Amino acid sequence: MNKPIIALDFQTYEEVEQFLAKFSGEALSVKVGMELFYSNGPIIVEKIKQQNHEIFLDLKLHDIPNTVKSAMVGLAKLGVDMVNVHAAGGKNMMEAALEGLEIGSGSGKRPKIIAVTQLTSTSEASMQSEQLIKTSLLESVLHYSALTNQAGLNGVVCSALEAEAIKQQNGADFLRVTPGIRLASDAADDQIRVVTPEKARLIGSTDIVVGRSITRANDPVAAYNQVLKEWNV
C-alpha cells in the first residue's frame, strides 16, 4: 500500500512528537520542511528517524552548483530518504546536487532527489507577470521536468494537474511528487492548483504530500486513513 507523505508543518519537536504519538508507533512517510528544520536543526531528522519514519527533507535548495553540491554532501549524511532542489537553478546545479548526494552517501543508500518545477501556489498569470515566463504553466513545468530528467534526478515536485503530461514526457518511473492535496471537505488555503487524493491517483501522481487536511483535522488518524483509502483504491 502506498503511503501518503504527511507534511509536518510544525515549529517544535514537541508538536511533532504529540502528533506522531497519535499513530501508535506506525511507520509513516513524513515531510520535514523549512519551518521545522530551520527552527530545530538537523537533530529533528535524527529524532524522527529513530521512530522508523521515512523522511522527505523539503529544503528546495537553489544556489550556485558548488554550494548546492557541498550542502547535499551534508544532507546525505543525515540519513533522509528524499531531498529536493529548485529546477530553476539549472541543469549544472542539479547535476552538482546529485554528485554531492553520492559523495555524502558513501557506500550507503543514496537519498532520492527531485526538483521543484512550479510551486502549487503559482498561477499561470503570476508566473507570466512576476517570473517573466511567457509560455503556459504546463510548458514551463514540462521544460523543467525534461531538464531534471537530463540531469539524472529521480523526478519532480509538481501539481497533479501536470502529472500525466510529465509521465508521457519522461516515463512512468520518473517520480511525480504532488503537494497541494486536500480532502474534498477542506479549504484550499494558499494553494491554487489543488486536487483530492483520489484525483491525484487517477491523473498520474506517484506520491502525494498532504499537510493541513491531516495535521489540522479534529481526528488526524481518521483523516490520514481517509487519505490512505482514496490514494489506494
Curated annotation (Swiss-Prot):
The keyword Lyase applies. Pfam families: OMPdecase. This is Orotidine 5'-phosphate decarboxylase. Catalyzes the decarboxylation of orotidine 5'-monophosphate (OMP) to uridine 5'-monophosphate (UMP). PANTHER family: OROTIDINE 5'-PHOSPHATE DECARBOXYLASE. Disulfide bonds: none annotated. Belongs to the OMP decarboxylase family. Type 1 subfamily. Homodimer. Pathway: Pyrimidine metabolism; UMP biosynthesis via de novo pathway; UMP from orotate: step 2/2. Its EC number is 4.1.1.23. One of its GO terms (biological process) is 'de novo' UMP biosynthetic process. It catalyses: orotidine 5'-phosphate + H(+) = UMP + CO2. The active site is at 60 (proton donor). Keywords: Decarboxylase, Lyase, Pyrimidine biosynthesis. It comes from Listeria monocytogenes serotype 4a (strain HCC23). GO terms for cellular component: cytosol. GO terms for molecular function: orotidine-5'-phosphate decarboxylase activity. Substrate binds at residues 9, 31, 58-67, 120, 182, 191, 211-212.
